[in-house]
Regions:
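Carbohydrate-active catalytic/glycan-binding domains of CAZyme proteins
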Residues: 1-194
Length: 194
């Protein structure tokens, strides 16, 4: 979960809805609820605002930010395996609806599309990409400096081949980003390939 401080003074808790009943997707959706710092409690009931930017499933780690006229939602998708990625959406209303970034995922180690929403194999080694030093790139958050430079910090791994074991576990990477003219976040080279 994360806390979002809007420019109008309101505060929101953004979290993952984890559904445990049979027949429901796990994890399911990103939810948001207003938070009152004076009362130190939530106001009302959580509302589903985002189901993800890809069909990779396993949505988690929501971050909400505001830049200019847009609210941006950034999430991890694809689980923590080789299908891991960072996705983004935006809306002019904090409650949505959020439009998917047309280039989702915005950061990944997996070239091309993958549709694994219902795949029980969370590591997904078939998506290992020998062209990339960084694997399992996902679960990110960005920062914009006063100079206008933008950086994304995200998780990744560097496996030993051919076993594809990552003995150092989840590592941290930082990558330079840029805002496009149409207000989408991209890697500085214009790609989505970590």
């Amino acid at each position: 979960a994360s806390l979002f401080h809007d420019t109008n003074g309101k505060k929101y808790v953004v979290s993952l809805e984890w559904e445990t009943r049979e027949g429901y997707e796990k994890p399911g959706a990103i939810c948001m609820v207003e938070y009152s710092p004076e009362k130190q409690e939530i106001v009302g009931y959580p509302k589903r605002i985002w189901r993800g930017g890809t069909d990779r499933g396993c949505i988690e780690a929501p971050h909400l930010t505001k830049r200019g006229e847009y609210y941006y939602i950034m999430c991890a998708e694809g689980g923590t395996g080789y299908n891991h990625c960072v996705t983004m959406g935006r809306s002019q209303n904090v409650w949505g609806p959020y439009e998917k970034d047309p280039k989702n995922p915005i950061v990944t180690s997996v070239p091309g599309e993958s549709y694994e929403r219902q795949d029980p194999d969370h590591l997904k080694p078939k998506y290992y990409n020998p062209e990339s030093i960084l694997q399992k790139s996902g679960h990110g958050s960005y920062v914009e400096l006063p100079t206008g430079e933008v950086y994304l910090v995200h998780l990744c791994s560097r496996p030993f081949v051919p076993e594809l074991r990552c003995t150092l576990g989840r590592e941290t990477a930082i990558q330079k980003m840029m805002w496009t003219e149409d207000n989408w976040l991209r890697l500085a080279d214009g790609s989505n390939f970590a």
